[in-house]
C-alpha cells in the first residue's frame, strides 16, 4: 500500500468551500420600526366609546395586528394596525362630536332665548298713552 501522497479527510470540507461559506452575505433590507397595534387605545374605545361597535372592531383589528406581529408578518400587522387606528378615530369622533354639537346648540339657544326674553320684557313694560291709539 502506497502512503507517500497526503490524503484528505473526505468528511472535512475543503478550504475553498469553507472560505466561500464564511464570506456569504445576505441582504435582508433595513428593518423598519415595528408596526403599532394600538391595543390600549382599542380597549379604551371598547369600554367607553363603543358607539355602533366601532370600539369592538378596533379591538379585533388590534388583536389581529398583534398576532401578525408575533408571527413575523409585519406588513399584515401594519395594515391591521392602521385599520384599528381608523376605527378608534371613528369611535372617538362618533361618540364625542354629537354631544359637543348638542352642547353648542343648547348654549346658543339659551343665549338667544335670554336676549329674546329681555327684548319682550322691554316691549311689555312700555306704557301707552291715549294719544298712541289715535
Curated annotation (Swiss-Prot):
Name this polypeptide is given: Interferon-induced transmembrane protein 5
Function: Required for normal bone mineralization.
Effect of residue 53 to A: Strongly reduces expression at the cell membrane. Reduces palmitoylation. Abolishes palmitoylation
PTM comment text: Palmitoylated.
Keywords: Cell membrane, Developmental protein, Lipoprotein, Membrane, Mineral balance, Palmitate, Transmembrane, Transmembrane helix
Organism per entry: Mus musculus
Miscellaneous comment as given in the Swiss-Prot or TrEMBL entry: Membrane topology is controversial. The N-terminus is cytoplasmic and the C-terminus extracellular according to PubMed:24715519, while both the N-terminus and the C-terminus are extracellular according to PubMed:18442316.
Extracellular side: 1-39, 110-134
